[in-house]
């Protein structure tokens, strides 16, 4: 089992140039990157970074959001052998925990900015190809 000890917001950007017209629709295609940082074998914690980017700062997209969040995780042995999770299983458990915190942060950030919050849909970690596994 994986537990998140804390999360740290490393970057948070919101640019809004939406025209207040309810008939205006645009597509939201978030780019999501998840990375597990290397750790020393004697370290009990693992650090993961998650980046979610909506829109682009370079083009004329009316909305741009970028959030980078870091999570500090600890693996807890589930049986008497004390065996910790394999990297692939760690990713499948750590990613949704950090993604949920990021989703909530993005919705809250938009609400504080006076916008209707975007509720990114949950992602099934079993359908993700974690590279490096």
How would you describe each model-predicted region?
Residues 1-97, 104, 108-133:
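N-terminal intrinsically disordered, cationic/polar leader segments
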């Amino acid at each position: 089992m994986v537990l998140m000890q804390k999360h740290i917001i490393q970057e948070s950007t919101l640019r809004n140039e939406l025209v207040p017209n309810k008939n205006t629709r645009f597509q939201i295609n978030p780019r999501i990157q998840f990375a597990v940082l290397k750790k020393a074998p004697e370290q009990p914690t693992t650090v993961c970074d998650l980046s979610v980017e909506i829109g682009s700062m370079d083009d004329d997209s009316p909305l741009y959001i970028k959030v980078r969040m870091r999570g500090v995780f600890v693996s807890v042995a589930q049986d008497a052998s004390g065996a910790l999770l394999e990297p692939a299983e760690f990713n499948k458990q750590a990613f949704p925990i950090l993604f949920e915190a990021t989703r909530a942060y993005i919705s809250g950030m938009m609400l504080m900015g006076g916008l209707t919050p975007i509720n990114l849909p949950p992602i099934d970690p079993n359908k993700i190809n974690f590279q490096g596994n």
